[in-house]
Amino acid sequence: FFIKAGSAGVGANDKIGVGLIGCNGMGFEDLKAFLRNPEVECIALSDIDENVLNNRAAETEKITGKKVKHLYKDWRKLIDNKDIDLVIVGTPDHWHCLQMVSACQAGKDVYCEKPLGNSIEECNIMVRAAQKYNRVVQVGQWQRSDPHWQDAMQFVHSGQLGKIRTVRVFSYQGWCPSIPVKPDEAVPAGVDYDCLLYTSDAADELDGVD
């Protein structure tokens, strides 16, 4: 769903420049989906793990036939890139709010993986940012776009089921293995812990989003 519709920043003959933050999970799947549109170009990738970054850059080149122009460990450099129109936020959940707001402040539209934020407060901040900076922000709730879900909801709302008295909901939690807890060890080669632990000026990034 769209939080706020903003104005397009590219001309009729231009491609939409996309940058991905967080390349090792759903974010890259989102990027591949975007790249199916011939009017989209991947401008930059960002990940704190250099190994992941290089692997995804190679995969993207294989898909598009072009080298990715910019590779960043620090996601803030991707946000600052003037050639990027749209930012895909595919990082772990606790990063979504800061990165989405920063992208909006930089005048970029955003596709953010679910969940939107870690709290209602974060979500409210993100909605206000989309409104304040007049940006298009879509959350990866893909089920809302699938016709069979829309048809089912339309059928329920039509009243053909009569008065609904009971709703049962289940959540299948066992499909993904849990992340193992590992003992302290040396920083893996290629991982930038300084970016991973960046929090000191996070409040400044959200300043002014009333």
Label each region the model flagged:
Residues 109-111, 117-190:
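A contiguous active-site-proximal alpha/beta segment in oxidoreductase catalytic domains
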Residues 106, 187, 200:
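Active-site-proximal cap/lid insertion segments
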Residues 1-112, 121-136:
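N-terminal glycine-/serine-/threonine-rich beta1-alpha1-beta2 phosphate-ribose binding loop
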Residues 41-43, 69, 162-165, 194:
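A short, local hydrophobic-aromatic micro-motif
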Residues 209-210:
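Hydrophobic alpha-helical segments, chiefly the membrane-spanning helices
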Residues 195-205:
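Conserved small/polar residues in nucleotide/adenosyl-binding loops
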Residues 91-92, 115, 202-203:
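Proline-centered helix-kink/hinge sites
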